[in-house]
Amino acid sequence: MGCLVVVKEILRLLFLLAMYELGKYVTEQVYIMMTANDDVEAPSDFAKLSDQSDLMRAEVSE
């Protein structure tokens, strides 16, 4: 009977540890979502894709 109590206590501690870690993860994800700044616009002098078309064109050397 004593062995059953020890196993039960270990399982309870593992469950508590798992819930603690889950709470940490969820809290971190909520914090990241709440502090995300998705409204950032590119600076006016930022290179446009059309400005780099000559760099992206494949060159074939013969």
From Swiss-Prot:
GO terms for biological process: regulation of DNA-templated transcription. The keyword Transcription applies. Keywords: Activator, Transcription, Transcription regulation. Disulfide bonds: none annotated. InterPro entries: Transcription_activator_RinB. It holds the Pfam family RinB. This is Transcriptional activator rinB. It comes from Staphylococcus phage phi11 (Bacteriophage phi-11). The lineage of its organism: Viruses, Duplodnaviria, Heunggongvirae, Uroviricota, Caudoviricetes. The gene is RINB.
